[in-house]
Each structure stands twice: as structure tokens, then as C-alpha cells.
Amino acid sequence: MPIRSIPLLVVAAWLGFVSAAAAAAPAPDDPYLAGYAGAVLEREFKVSRRAVSVDNGVLTLDAAQLAGADRARILTTLSALPGVTRVEVREAAAPAAAPPAGAGADPTAAERATLPTGFLPVGHLFQPLLADPRWPHFSAAYRYYFGDPDLKHVGAVSFGETIPIFRGNAPGESQWEAGIQAGVFAVFQMDQPSKDLFNADYFAALYGAWRQGSFSTLGRLFHQSSHLGDEFLLRSRIQRVNLTYESVDLKLSYDLPWGIRAYGGGGYLFDQEPDLLPWSVQGGVEFRSPWTLASGQIRPVAALDLQSREQNGWNVDVSLRGGIQLENVRLFDRNLQLLVEYFHGNSPDGQFFKRRVEYLGLGAHFHF
């Protein structure tokens, strides 16, 4: 079988798996969501399941039953449940003086807060792209490269975060958010005696996000630069590329039934060195199972990310990741995911952006 056909077969098999899973499973209905959300409230927050009701995917919480609980964390956790379109908190109506004759009664007050607002709020309006090789987050992975002249056994780590600085409410029960992203992505040659650093990319961004119901968008202005490891540079005498650029990009995302999400977008480089062609496009699909295993402790997840750049002749870079999310393992309110990963395309490691690579790996990822 030609090697070029392998990524297409892998993508086709992955899409077939997601389609079959979606077709075989009924959409999460309101009774299912009520039971699921109630179990989360009781298990993680010691709040009675009677505090939640569901209508067409909208969760309504009784504020009186949330007394003493971490309301912000409850909103963040329940908003992330598959099938949930919005979370509201119904406050108890305060006694009021009788209205003047002929005046209509005020409607019941309700806090339509999908997520908390203000400075340094918890949660995120735009969810992470699980298979994007350059999404800032904390991770560590082993990768095996096929047929690469320099890489075979590789350790890959990333250190990064998305930090919302301010979030506010917007018309139509939508919300907006502004913040920063930053990350470092490094790969090491594990088969070298000193485990040489091969390449490190540095990323920093200002971002704005907006969400209404199942639709969300993310726009970024960012800088990225790339650097070779000293040991590799001295040993190989390779010609170093001074790769650095600024970029703007925009991503659109929509949450579908059965835990499926689709997204797409594009980007444009400027102030780039060397003189790279500027345009790029990106799209993908994710599956976060609404159904869990092992008494709610394990959630299957899978993701496909496709990217194409003008600089590389619009060749498609294929990134596939799939595995499990451990629901009972959280660090700083982040979920731990154990994922098998496959990549075929132009290298995401900046110094080697012209090189076609293929690898298979296994990693641990912390995502919000």
C-alpha cells in the first residue's frame, strides 16, 4: 500500500468510528441530562440533585440549594457537560412593594450566567482544540517517528495556558471574553546520550472570545518564534533558520448533539522572517462522549485536526488523537486525558516547517 494513502485511510476509519458512535447512540435528552447533572452535583459538590432542572438542554439551578457551595466551579463544570446549551441560576425573588395600579408584575429574576463574569473569571468560552499540535496546554508525550533522518524516539512536552482576563455579558444571552495565551513546545531526542533538545517553539497571544449557546468564536493576535537545541546544533552543523512571525487568526466552533463539535477558521502571517507565504486554513471535529465508563470515572474522547498552509503548497497536515479523560483526576481544575496520537504532514516544529514527518505517540494532557 502506498505510504501516502495511509493518512487518508486513518482519517476515514476515524470518521467512521465517530459517525457510528453518533448514529448508534440516542441524543442526550432532558431526563438523561438531569440525572447526569444531578450526579455531578452530589458527587463533586455535595449538593442535592433536586437543585437542578432541565428544559431543552438548559440547566436551571436553584440558588437557595447552592448555599455554601462553590457556585463558580459548579457553573464551569455543568457548562462543560455534553448536551448542555446553557446554565442558569434562579435567584429567590426578593419581597417587593405592591406595584402601582395598572403596572405589570416584574418577571422572576434569573441569573443567565453561562459562566461567571468580571476580572480573572473561571472557565473559558472557547473550548480547547484537542488535536491541534500548537494549542497551549500542559502535556508530555512519547512519539515514534517513521523514516525521519534525525528523529526516532522522541519526548515531546508543552507548557502553556489560556487565561481569561475579563468576561462580560453581551446582548442575546451571549458572553464575551478577553485574555492571553502562552505556551512553549519542545521536543527531545531520547535516543541521544544527553537526551538532546531538538527544537523549541515559543508562543504568546492576546485573544478575544465570544459565545452564544452552542456557537463560539476565538480571535487571536500572536507571536511565535522557533529555536534549535544547542546540542543538536553543535552535533549536526545543520543550517539554522531564524523563524519568527506575528499572526492573526479566527476560529469558529459549533457544539453538535452526542458530544460532537465541529470547528474551522483561518490565519494570516505578517512581519515574518523568512518571507513566508501568509495564508493558512484549519478545520476539525471532536467527540467527547456523553456516556462514561467505570461508574462515571472514564470518558472516551477523540479529535481530528486538519491544517493547510500556503507556504507548504496547501499540503494537508493530519493530526489525530483519541483516548480517555479521567473524570476523577483534576489538577487546578483541569482534566487529565490519556491520548494516542498520530500525525502526518509538514512538521509543526518551527525550524523544520518544510519537512514532511509522520509519527505515532502516547501522551498525557491537561485540558480545561
State where each predicted segment sits.
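N-terminal targeting leaders
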Residues: 5-103
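Transmembrane beta-barrel domains of Gram-negative outer membranes and organellar outer membranes
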Residues: 104-209
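Predominantly the C-terminal beta-signal and adjacent terminal strand-loop region
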Residues: 124-125, 313-368
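Short loop/turn motifs that connect adjacent beta-strands in outer-membrane beta-barrel proteins
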Residues: 126-132, 166-178, 255-260, 289-300, ...
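Membrane-embedded beta-strand positions of outer-membrane beta-barrel proteins
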Residues: 138-140, 178-182, 208, 219, ...
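Transmembrane beta-strands of outer-membrane beta-barrel pores
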Residues: 142-148, 165-167, 182-188, 212-214, ...
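Residues on the lipid-exposed face of transmembrane beta-strands in outer-membrane beta-barrel proteins
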Residues: 159-165, 206-212, 250-254, 283-289, ...
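Outer-membrane pore/translocation modules
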Residues: 172-284, 344-346, 353-356
